[in-house]
Amino acid sequence: MAERANLVFHNKVIDGTAIKRLISRLIDHFGMAYTSHILDQVKTLGFQQATATSISLGIDDLLTIPSKGWLVQDAEQQSLILEKHHHYGNVHAVEKLRQSIEIWYATSEYLRQEMNPNFRMTDPFNPVHMMSFSGARGNASQVHQLVGMRGLMSDPQGQMIDLPIQSNLREGLSLTEYIISCYGARKGVVDTAVRTSDAGYLTRRLVEVVQHIVVRRTDCGTIRGISVSPRNKNRMMSERIFIQTLIGRVLADDIYIGSRCVAFRNQDLGIGLVNRLITFGTQSISIRTPFTCRSTSWICRLCYGRSPTHGDLVELGEAVGIIAGQSIGEPGTQLTLRTFHTGGVFTGGTAEHVRAPYNGKIKFNEDLVHPTRTRHGHPAFLCYIDLSVIIESEDIIHSVTIPPKSFLLVQNDQYVESEQVIAEIREGTYTFHFKERVRKYIYSDSEGEMHWSTDVSHAPEFTYSNVHLLPKTSHLWILSGGSCGSSLILFSIHKDQDQMNIPFLSVERKSISSFSVNNDQVSKKFVSSDFDDKKKSEIPHYSDLNGNLGTSHYNFIYSAIFHENSDLLAKRRRNRFIIPFQSIQEQEKKFIPHSGISIEIPINGIFRRNSIFAFFDDPRYRRKSSGILKYGTLKADSIIQKEDMIEYRGVQKFKTKYEMKVDRFFFIPEEVHILPESSAIMVQNYSIIGVDTRITLNIRSQVGGLIRVERKKKRIELKIFSGDIHFPDKADKISRHSGILIPPGRGKTNSKESKKLKNWIYVQRITPTKKKFFVLVRPVATYEIADSINLATLFPQDLFQEKDNIQLRVFNYILYGNGKPTRGISDTSIQLVRTCLVLNWDQENNNSSLEEIRAFFVEVSTKGLIRDFIRIGLVKSHISYIRKRNNPSDSGLISADHMNPFYSISPKAGILQQSLRQNHGTIRMFLNRNKESQSLLILSSSNCFRIGPFNHVKYHNVINQSIKKNPLITIKNSLGPLGTAIQISNFYSFLPLLTYNLISVIKYLQLDNLKYIFQVINSYLIDENGRIFNLDPYNNVVLNPFKLNWYFLHQNYHHNYCEETSTIISLGQFFCENVCIAKKEPHLKSGQVLIVQRDSVVIRSAKPYLATPGAKVHGHYREILYEGDTLVTFIYEKSRSGDITQGLPKVEQVLEVRSIDSISLNLEKRIKGWNKSITRILGIPWGFLIGAELTIVQSRISLVNKIQKVYRSQGVQIHNRHIEIIVRQITSKVLVSEEGMSNVFLPGELIGLLRAERTGRALEEAICYRAVLLGITRASLNTQSFISEASFQETARVLAKAALRGRIDWLKGLKENVVLGGVIPAGTGFNKGLVHCSRQHTNILLEKKTKNLSLFERDMRDILFYHREFCDSSISKSDFSRI
C-alpha cells in the first residue's frame, strides 16, 4: 500500500450507497481477500463508535416540522375549493378524487423534503436523524410518518382513500385516522404472507424456463450487437446507469475516436475502460448481449460477459440460466417482506409543471392547440407537437418549448405573473406506464327525479336495460322531491293535478298491488305488510282508512295508468266515457278467479284509433296442454296492437291476433318438452311410451304415445303424440301430406273392417326411414265459436247505443295462426280465443283529425263509499276555445274540474270542492324499476324556492307582437308551474326542452342552437308546437315558452351606448349553483325553473352531477331514484401504485406476456402490427423473415425496459444480463404460418427462430413464419425435453403427447438429468472436448452445403445484413437505460 503521508483524507458521511461503491472499488484494486480484511476493520471501528455514542431513541427526539401547520391548512383550503366546484357541478367525482390525491400527496412530499434540512439545522445529532439517514434502521419514509404526516393510505384493494391522515405518529391519531391506518397495517401483514408464496412460484417458473442454459463455448462468432448511447432524444441517461449497463460486457465492434482505435472487438469492459470512453465522449457503443448469441439452447462466454462473482469472463460450464432466474425471482421474495414497513401509505408521482420565469404576456400559435379538459377538470389546451410559447415582458422575450401531449393552462395574450404555472407536462409520454381500467360508481345523495341535458344512447351490452351511454360531457340532474311507495295508489286514483289527502301509513317500497275483478264487484288484493304483518292478503276497510287520513293537502300529477289489467263496469256520458268501479266494504278475504273483463290501458294513457280497449278471455277456450291449431282457409286479418309498440318496457314481444270469420276450429293436443342440449334422454326417437314414463332424470310424461325427438340449435325438442298407430297395407292410399282432418261419419279402413267415426280425427303419416312408414291417428278437440259470447251482455246496453263520438265494436280473435303450434310455459294455461272490445270514434265531426283519446282514473268518495271511474276523453285543441267576454262561467272545453288544477276531493262532502291553496305538494307518478309497481314523487314547498323581485327585467318583444295580433290573448301575472299544464300531447312524441348551461350571452342569442330533442316519458310540459298553458282558470292564455325569456340589461357607462347582455331564463331551464344572473341580484341555487312570473322565478332545487363522455347512466329519463341508488358509472384509467405488492404482479404480468385487468401496452398487439406492416411492404417471403426478426428485437427491448422499471422503482439493482437471458427464451420461438406451405413444419407449429433460419438455408427455400411471444409458463411447456416439461406442469398430458409422437429426450438440460439421476452437464460435469468436437463437425457439414447457395439466399442474407444495421441504428437512438 502507499505510505500514510500520501493518502487522501475524505471527510464525508458514508451511507449505504457509498459503502457499496467503496467495496466495489476495493475488489477491483486489491482483490477479495484484502477487501474482506479492510471491511473487518471498518466494522470494528463502527461498533466502537456506536458504543461510545450510546444512541438511544426517546419520544422527545421526534420533532415535528414547524411548517407543517400552514402546509396542511393550505391543502385543506384547496380541498374546500375543490369540494365547492364538485358541488356546483364543475368537476365530477373522478376528477375530484384525482385532484384531492395530488393535493395531499404534494403536501406530504413537501413535508418529507423539509424534514432533513430541518433536522440538520436544529439538531444535527438527533438520534432519529442519524439512524434514518445512516441506513442502519428505518428510512426517510418511516421517519416522515413519525414526525411529518402519514398522508394518504391504500385500502385492501389498492384503491386510494381520499381522506388523508394529517397527524403523525408522534402527535397520535384520531379514531377515524386510526381505522384508516389499520387498512394499511393489515394490508402489509396479509401481503407478507400471500406475496411470499407468489414470489417463490415466480422464481420456480423463471428457473424452469432457463435451467438448461449453460456456457458451452467461448465465441459463437456473431457480428451483431446492441448499441448503447448515453444521450437520447428524450432525456440524458444517468451516468450511473450507463456505467452499470456497460461494465462486464464484451464489445461487439471496434471503437474509434477519430482514426485511432481505443477498444477492439471482443474486449471485455472494465471500470477503467468505461470511464475512458465516457471521458472521450463516445456517442454509441455496440455491445454483445445474450440476445445476439447465435446458439439455440446454450450461450457463449463473450455474449454473456464477465461473471458477477469474480469479475473475469464467465467460465465454461457455468449454469448462467439458473443464476439469472434466481437473480430476478429472489428480490421479489425479499421485497414482499418490506411492504408493511410503510403500512400501505400511498406513493405516486405528480406531473411536471412549467412556470413563468417573470411577469409578462403569453404568445403562442392557437392553430397548434385545441381545447380540452385536464384530468382534474380544468380547462386547458392540448398540443400535439412541440409548441413554442413566448413570454413577453417590457424588455425581455423568453421562449419556452412545450413537449407534445402536454397541457397549456393559459390563454393566448394572457398576462401571467412570475412562478405561475403555464403548462403541465404529462408524465410518462416516453415510457411504458402500467395503467388499469377502474370503475367508479357514483351514488345519488338524495332521492328525486333524474334528468339529463344531452342525447344519450344505449350501451351496446345493455340494449334492453336502463343503462345509457353519454356521448359528450353533460350534467345529470336529480330534481328534488320525496317519494312514497306504490301501495298508496290503491286508494288514491285521481285525475292529474287533483289535490287530495294522503294517509300517513307506513309504506314499503316493494309492495305489490293487483286487481282481480268480475262483473259484480271489484276486489283489491294487497300483498304487502302495510296494514297488518300477519294477514298477507286482506281487503282494507275504507271507512277506517278515511278516519286515519292526515290533514296535509298534496297536488297529484301522474300520467302512467295502472300496468295491471283492471276489470271495470261501464257507463256512458256525452263527451266522456266513464266506467265506475264498485268497491266492497266487507273485510272478508276474497279470491276471485281472473275470468272477468280485462281492460288494456297503455302506460301513457293514450288510445289510438281502432285500438283494443277491453278483452274477455272465455275459460271454455283455455287449454292446459300444448298443441296445434287448425281451422279453415277463410280470410284472416293479422292485427297488431299499436299500444304494444308504444309501451316503454325493456323487451316487448308482439303477439299477433287473427280476426277470424270461422265458426269452429280444431285443437290437436301434444305434450312438448324443451330440453337443454346436454340433457340425458332416457327414451328413443319413434318409440312408444305409456303414461308416467321417465323421459329424463327429472321429467315424467303426462300422456302416453309416440315419442318424436328433434335436435335444434342448443336445445332438444321432445314431443309426445297421443293416439293410435296403424300399419296400412300397400293397397291403402294414404295422403302424403303432413296431416289431414277427417270429419265424423266417414269410414276408415283398418284390418278390413269398417267403422263410423264419432269425432273428428287427425291422420298423420310418419316415416322413420325411407321404406318404412306408419299412420298416427290423433284425437282432436273441436271448438265452436258462439256468436252469443260478446261484451254486450257484460256491459250496460247504453254503451253500444249512443253514436255521438265514441263507438265500441266487438270482435273475436284467435290468438294463434292456422297450423301454428301453441306452447304452454310450465303450469300456465293457453288462451285460444279472445273476445275484444275495440274503440273507435266518429270521424264526421269537426275533430275527425284527432287520432288519440286519453284515459285516466278518477276516484270519488261519498260517505265512506269510494267509487272509482275510468274516464275516456277526446284530446282536443284547446287554442280554439277562447273565453267569451263577460261570461266567467263559460270556459270552453275546460270544465268545472279543469278550471283549477288544485282541487280537492273531500271524503265527507262527496262533491268536488274547488280550493286554491298555496304551497301544496305536487305529486308525480313514475315507473319503478321492476315495471310492475309505481312510485309517487311528492314535490312540496320545501323543494322549491322563489327568487325575486328582479330589477332590469325586460320581456322580449315577441310577446308584445303576438298580443297585437290576437288581442284575446292576455298576459297574467303568473305562468303556471312547469309540468302542471293540461295534458294535450302524446308523451312519446319528441318534445323540445331548453337545457343548456350558458347563462350570460352577449346580444341576442338564437335559441334554436340550444334546443335538444328528447324522447320524454310521462312528460306533458309542452306540446309538439312548443305551446304551454297558463293555469289561471279564467284566462286561457297560450304562450310560446321559447319566446318567454328574460333579458337583463347591464349598462355600460364607459361608452355612450347600452350594451344588451341578455341573461335568458326560460321555463324548464336548469341552473348551476352560484350563477349570478344580474348585477346586484342574488346568486341562484342549482335547480330547474318551475314558474316564471313578472318579477320573480320559482326554482325547483336540483343537484347536478357532471359526467364525461363514455360514462354509463343507470336509469331512464325522469325515473325516480332513491338515496343511495347507483346514478352513473365512470370508467377511467389510473396508474397502478408503485409498491412491490402490486409491482410483483406487474413483473409476472410482463413475463407471462398477458394483460390481466390493465390496459397497458399489449406487446402481442404490437407484434401483429409489425407483422402486417412489414409483410405488406416487402412481400411474403422477405417480409416474414425480416418482420419476425424486427418484431423480436423490438419486443425484447420493451420487455427488459418494463421489468427493470419495476425493480428500479424499489431500489433493487439487477444486471440486464439476467433479464435478457429470460426474455431471450420467451421471445425465441416463431409460429409457422400457412402462407407458403413447407414440407418440414406444420402450420401453427412452434419452432425456434434460429432453427427456422437454418432450415431455410439448408432447404434453399423460404419458410414463412410469424414472431410470437410466449409467457414463461408456455415457454416451459415448449422445450426440447419432455421430461423437463412433465416435471413442471400437466404431467399426464405432456407424457401422453410425447409417447404418441415418439419424442426423444437428449438429456441436455440440468433438470432432466437431475430427474433421472445422471450427472448434470454443468460445472465439473461439463464435457468440454465432446461438445467442441461435435460442434466443429457440424460446422464443417454446414459449410459444405453453403457453397451451393442460390441467388435468392444471397439476396436474403444481404437484406438481413442491412436490416441488422438498420435495427442497430434504431436501437441506438432508444434509451438503453430502460433495458
From Swiss-Prot:
Cellular localisation: Plastid, Chloroplast
Cofactor binding: number and manner: Binds 1 Zn(2+) ion per subunit.
Molecular function terms from GO: DNA binding; DNA-directed RNA polymerase activity; zinc ion binding
Main location (coarse class): plastid
Catalytic activity: RNA(n) + a ribonucleoside 5'-triphosphate = RNA(n+1) + diphosphate
Pfam families attached to this UniProt entry: RNA_pol_Rpb1_4 (PF05000), RNA_pol_Rpb1_5 (PF04998)
Gene3D superfamilies named in the record: 1.10.132.30, 1.10.150.390, 1.10.1790.20, RNA polymerase Rpb1, domain 3
CDD domains found in the cross-reference section: RNAP_beta'_C (cd02655)
Any one of the GO BP annotations: DNA-templated transcription
Annotated family: Belongs to the RNA polymerase beta' chain family. RpoC2 subfamily.
Protein name (Swiss-Prot/TrEMBL): DNA-directed RNA polymerase subunit beta''
